[in-house]
Each structure stands twice: as C-alpha cells, then as structure tokens.
Amino acid sequence: MESFVDEVAIEVFAGHGGAGSVHFRREKYVEFGGPDGGDGGIGGNVVIRPNLSMYTLDKYLSKRKFKAQAGFPGVGDNCSGKKGEDLVLFVPLGTQIYDEETGDLLFDFVSDSQEFVVARGGRGGKGNAHFKTSTNQTPRFAQPGEEGEYKFLRLSLKLLADVGIVGLPNAGKSTLISKITDAHPKIAGYAFTTLSPNLGVVKRRGDIFRFTIADIPGIIEGASMGIGLGLSFLRHIERVKGILYLFDASSLDIEEDLKMLRNELSTYNPELLNRPYLIVLNKIDIWNDPEFTKDVIAKVSHLGKVVAISADQEVNLEELLENMDEVFFKNEIEKILNPIKDTKPISLDESDIFES
C-alpha cells in the first residue's frame, strides 16, 4: 500500500559527455592517413514529467540518487558518438521542484503537458580531427567529454484540488468525500483518523463537468505553528478555488470553531481567506428534527452561506453540490453549457466589395 509522502530530497546527475576519438584514416597506398576521430556524444539529460496516476512521492524514499546515461565515445571516419539516453523521472501533478542548496523554486507542475529538463548532459569531447594543424598533421589526442550537470533537489507536492475540506478532527470530512467521489479513505469514529490528505473527483451535470476535492487531516488550534498534525498538510489547500468549512452540527460553538479555523489558515497563508467558502453542518441525522436544524442554521447564517447535511445518511448532498456549483464554479459551468461561438464580424471595408 502506498504511503503518502509529499516532500523528499533527491540528487540527479546528467550524463557525462562522451570522449572524442583518436583515430586515423586507413587508406590503401597511404601509409599514414589523416586524423578522422569523431566527437563524443552529448550526455543524457535528466527530465521530470508529471504522471496523473501518481498521488505521492513515496517511490523516492528507497532511491535518492539518479543518473542519466553518458554520451558514447566518438569513432573513426569522423563519426560522432551517440547521445546518452535521457533519464525521465515522474512526479504527481502539483509537485514543485526546488534547488535544495539555494531554496529557489525551479519549476511548478500545474499541467500534465509540462516537462522540465532539470539537469543537462555534458558536451561530448572533440575528436582528433579538430586538432590537425600545419605543424601537427597527426594529433594523437582528443578532448574528454564534459561532466553533466548535478542538482540537489527538493520535491514538494501541493495537491491540485479545486475544493478543500477543512474542519476539526472527527467532523466527517472523510465520510463526505467518500460519498460524493469515488475515493475510499479510512473512516472511523475517533479523532485524527485521517493522517494524510485524500483526493477525489466529483462528477457533475451528467459528467460534462468535473472537479477535484481534497480533505486534509483535522485542524486544531495551533496547527499553523506545528501543533497536532501541524502545518505539514495545510499547503495542500493553497491552490484550491474554494473551501468547505465542515462542522459537527452538534458543536457547542460553531462560530468560535470557524474563527479558529480561519485564523489558522490566515496564519499559514493570508491569501486563503480570500477564497470563496461554504459552511457545512454535518451529522444532522443525530436529532432528525427539521425544525431544530433550521434553528441551528439560523444561528450561524450571518457567518456565510450554510448547508446542513448528513454525509453518513446521504442527506442533502445534492443540495451541497448545487451550492458548490454556484459558489465555486458558476462561470466555468456556464461556459460549458453556453459556449460562445467564434464568429467573425462582416467586413464593411470598401476594398472587400467587388463589382461583377
């Protein structure tokens, strides 16, 4: 079973350039042919690409050093050596590549069509054919190939989810994501069941529109400072378009809980408070009283748009999804349902008018 690993350091070595050749022509009736040593091949590059089937960096725990193939040496008849084969490393979409020595962000994978050449292979050495001069007709030396680039990298994964579910421990985040997506997180009736983010895909409008949703481990006061499971997973909601603040509807003070959660997000990254959000009251099946549910909603409605659900009993889940469509994805869905035709205006330029 995969373990969720979202940060790891690795070393990569591009391929060494191939050596130039020391070689001389062998011609009939020519005792000493001229130099014809070919150049060495370029070393292979180290290339990083995203893989949509990967959700963790755990494969890089067992192996931390990676080296591309060296370029092949040159040969006679001025033939260059073959280029070394590139080494391709795959990472989950959302992975950021940092230079571990400088801390600089080198690349951010936000599209599955991207590719990043992180280390380039060394140039091949020149063969002895390059070194023939009027005073040295038979050079017996060639250049060695150059070293390939070396990089010490930190791979840091930030999930590319459209919606993030944020809540206290045991609010029902994993149950909710299991009901509205095809994800199958571990679910239990105790705090901190979720020890790593879960990612699922929500299909809407007959599957013409999809979005991804992630739940992160429960947040407690001080999470942004490392308390509880800490800030290690907060970065996975940095890219979301919208946030669901999920609460156990029987909480004694939902307003204070919301204030605490938003304070933790703000301490970690103030930009998160600018994301649109919904307040979701879960577990309303506990009392099974519609009027009481209305009273609970009324008490917190001044905090934002509120939806009351029971994830476990699948109550009001469609209402929740409709609100998510409206609050988070209204423009995107409208563009899909009502595409604008690309029409060109009729030209009234006199030059376009011809007499028959």
UniProtKB/Swiss-Prot annotation:
GO terms (BP aspect): ribosome biogenesis
Subcellular localization(s) per the UniProt record: Cytoplasm
Keywords linked to the UniProt accession: Cytoplasm, GTP-binding, Hydrolase, Magnesium, Metal-binding, Nucleotide-binding
Cofactor(s) the protein requires to work: Mg(2+)
Residue sites binding GTP per the record: 167-174, 192-196, 215-218, 282-285, 310-312
OBG-type G domain ranges (all copies): 161-329
Domain spans labelled Obg: 2-160
Role, per record: An essential GTPase which binds GTP, GDP and possibly (p)ppGpp with moderate affinity, with high nucleotide exchange rates and a fairly low GTP hydrolysis rate. Plays a role in control of the cell cycle, stress response, ribosome biogenesis and in those bacteria that undergo differentiation, in morphogenesis control.
Protein name, as recorded: GTPase Obg
Organism name: Leptospira interrogans serogroup Icterohaemorrhagiae serovar Lai (strain 56601)
Lineage: Bacteria, Pseudomonadati, Spirochaetota, Spirochaetia, Leptospirales
